[in-house]
């Protein structure tokens, strides 16, 4: 019996996938990312004007270059620890509805090529699945990608619940 050696195919060629640039932030022990193109600025938390009778996740409003932005606690939206009085505000671009997300910190910028799906857990506290596009790994951390459009739709639906 003669044994034939097949040629080594070499490293498997994967298709060139586009890289997506994101800013990574943390709330408690969880990591999240926002597409870089959806981010206008990052501010240290400063004076936030509180709104009476607002839902708990709506921390208040701030003036961003003469425009009002709603400050939303990412931790409260997702049912996680609240960032408290400290932290950073991630100001989304105006086409995302004048939103400033309150987070604990940012850890930097990175990119990803492939997202993993998020399993739906209907018993989970918070609104994790509604605004998360998927997850990816970076430096051993599991990072959940926030879809700004899904966030805006979720906010709109929350505000219209009381309109009967």
Where are these regions (language model features)?
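An acidic, low-aromatic, low-complexity terminal/linker signal
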Residues: 1-164
């Amino acid at each position: 019996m003669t044994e034939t050696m097949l040629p080594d195919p070499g490293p498997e060629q994967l298709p060139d996938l586009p890289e997506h640039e994101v800013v990574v932030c943390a709330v408690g022990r969880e990591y999240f990312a926002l597409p870089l193109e959806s981010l206008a600025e990052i501010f240290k938390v400063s004076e936030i004007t509180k709104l009476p009778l607002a839902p708990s996740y709506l921390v208040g409003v701030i003036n961003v270059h003469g425009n009002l932005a709603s400050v939303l606690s990412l931790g409260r939206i997702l049912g996680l620890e609240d960032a408290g009085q400290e932290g950073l505000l991630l100001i989304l671009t105006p086409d995302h509805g004048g939103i400033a997300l309150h987070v604990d910190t940012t850890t930097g910028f990175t990119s990803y090529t492939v997202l993993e799906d998020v399993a739906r857990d209907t018993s989970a506290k918070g609104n994790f699945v509604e605004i998360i596009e998927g997850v990816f790994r970076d430096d051993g951390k599991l990072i959940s990608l926030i879809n700004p459009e899904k966030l805006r739709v979720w906010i709109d639906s929350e505000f219209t619940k009381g309109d009967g």
